[in-house]
Amino acid sequence: MADKCLTRIENVLKKSSIATEKAQSILNDIKKAQSETKIADLDETIVSKLADGVLKRQQIQKKINKLNALEDEVKIRNTVDYVLKEFSSNPTEGLAAVLVGSNLQKQGSRSSVALAQLSYYRDIVVSFQAKLSENKVNTLFAEANADIERRVSRVIWEVGNDVKITEKNKDIVTLGKVIAEFSETVRKKYNDYGANTEKLAGWIVRQSSDPFQLRNAVDVLNLKNKKNIKEINGTPERNVAAWKEYILPKLDQKRTFANTDGSPQAIDEFLDFAYNSLIKNQNQVVDGAGNSFGSRSLAERIGAKRVLHFNTSDDWFDYNAMFGGKNLKESLFDGFNMAGRNIGMMSMLGSNPQKNFLKIGDLVKRQLILNKKQGQAEKVGNFIQEKQGGYVKFMAEVDGSVNTINGFAAAKWSGITRSILSMAKLGGAVVSAIADVHLYARELKWQGRSYVGGVAEALGRLAKIKNSKQKAEIAEQLGFIADNLVYDLAARYSGSDNLNRNFTQIQRTFFKLNGLSWWTNSLKDGAMLGMGNYVAKQRKIPFNNLTPEFKRLITHFGINEKIWNVIRKMDVERADDGKEFFSARNIDNLSDDVIKNLSGVTKMSKRQVTIARDNLKTRVLGMFLDRSTYAVIEPDARTRGYLKFGLQAGTGPGEAIRFFSQFKAFPYAIINRALGRELAFLEAGQKMRAFQGVANLVIGSAIFGYISMTAKDLLKGKKPRDPINKKTFFSAMLQGGGLGIYTDFLFGQIQQSTSALATIAGPGLTEATKVAAIFNYITKGEFSKAGKQGYLSIKENIPFLNLFYLKTAFDY
């Protein structure tokens, strides 16, 4: 009956004036709606109701598209006006600032797309953790094993599908409900920004995928042990076939393939597209409302992200263990990350961000031509050229396309090589990181606090080892999340890589054992709390009476007089020792009238008020997040853009630049952020302040670099170097990062068998040069030298052996 009804509808659509593509879309949506109802046999009345529902949804999509177009135009015009006003002398820098921020002392110069993405992500994570604590299931979530996670997943699916919950354990039910409800909250937030994402059970955890597992499906599924080795091989074709064979029985085929004609060929093409997209990491690209995961609006387009609907939660859980985020927790945080990046992008650039940014650039260029500023117009034109303009390297960072894979084998083995080199060379990174204390104090000085107080704050936090539970919660609501949760420590010294599960876990363990995890987390936590206390102390001061330094700090993030005089009146957080801290979460408690007043609009819908409140909160959170990574230097999107130039992993140029940039992310971040912060005073007309800032940065780096260098010498059993010697002073500046150029072994000396050029080019080429030297010795008959060099090369590239405490014992 159902097939006859659908055939009749199809015939009517063919005879109507509706375009073929649109007619097929309507029919596909009816089929999908049929699958969603879980009813096998449909009569004409039910099919008619489904058709009515589909038509209503398509009418809603039309309204959403119109609203998106209107709101996009407002964002575009506002951004154009902002760039022309604040960056009148350098509009190209203004466009870069929109994407990745700028050090120039302009209103909102740090409130970039990249920072909005980070702020939304952290806000989502912090809000989720608060929900876990509120429902007293945070410990269960943190310690859940595979069996518990499977049962939690069942609850998530049952809640999402509005069916009876079968789980008997109350805590597991509570945890499942919290995740399901929070998933819905995030999905609705997507839709607030212009998406039309359908309700899916477990939507937030469905977006994770491991391209390395997919590409090795034969091995992952252990097929070689089950069949003749000649029959099963690891070719790309066999891997995709193995993946299809595994996933197809687990899929709700009516729902998954609703936008196809259902033929075996169409299903096969659908799965081919999905597989190829996943192994290239294309599902991690954020591209706005229409193409977001689960979006209805572009479901019929070839480029839309494929949604794989599973029959049951167990089917999803089994698949995820093999080819997804491995476990529920990792899949959940992957989903949070994608949500934060997409929402942050849309909040700044609208529902079609890539297209809208180019339109912004074009409008800026046109206005400059009208203003007879031809030179600036040409620079802007070059910057916004598609595929080759200067903006590409920054856009690739914020939309994630730089992390897509174009050449799987090259990306995999190059990433593994760089991971091994990191774990073989960074064992003493925490000793070298002593210079962080100086950089920390310089940032506090820039904020308007004292340098000596900054040194004391950093050392005091390191000496404390661990904060009280209450202060940890306060730091968390300001956006602090420990690096052992977000796993970004490796990116501090390199451009970051996509790694398979095993190497990712090994690398996490390494950074815990070398002490860098504790060091970085402690200083970040201290920077957050210190700044939170500093801002709270200013709350009784009206905007016009603020110190120039503090006013400069907040205006960098678009916090003007109107905003400051509202947020300073909010309640503060109080720790057990009586200290007061600014409360970012209290922004959620601001009344709708206050939000409307800040927006300057009296008539706002509930959705618009929610968006305005979210944007205010993430702007304030962004201030704490951004400045904490100036205090504890980390490469931001701007730094990574210059290091990778938007080049994809797996390509020749992409891998070459990644090898070259290994271990250079941190020193380049010092140049871009710490030095750039001081040089920004030049553009602001304060030349003497710029000179003093640079001089203090370099001299302080030399002092702390000498301390670090001496500590490493003592660990090696050497005497401290003469501080008066010119070479020592120069080495100390390098060690402390004052000149902004690290050698690849964190200022180790260049080996005799390698060239300076190879060392500058990166550790990969350095080690390759050493291997070449071995063969060179062999051809000359100098076998003892070849053996010695071979021994050194092996010893120096064994992961974990160079941990500073192990290396001291090993060398001894």
Question: What is each residue range found by the language model?
Answer:
Residues A142-L248, G428, D436-L439, S468, ...:
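Structured, mid-chain assembly/scaffold modules that mediate subunit interfaces
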Residues V155-G176, P249-I267, N356-G375, K379-E386:
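Charged, compositionally biased non-catalytic regions
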Residues T312-V431, A435-F729:
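Hydrophobic, often aromatic-rich secondary-structure segments at membrane interfaces
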Residues E476-N521, F747, A758, P763-Y812:
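Amphipathic, membrane-inserting segments
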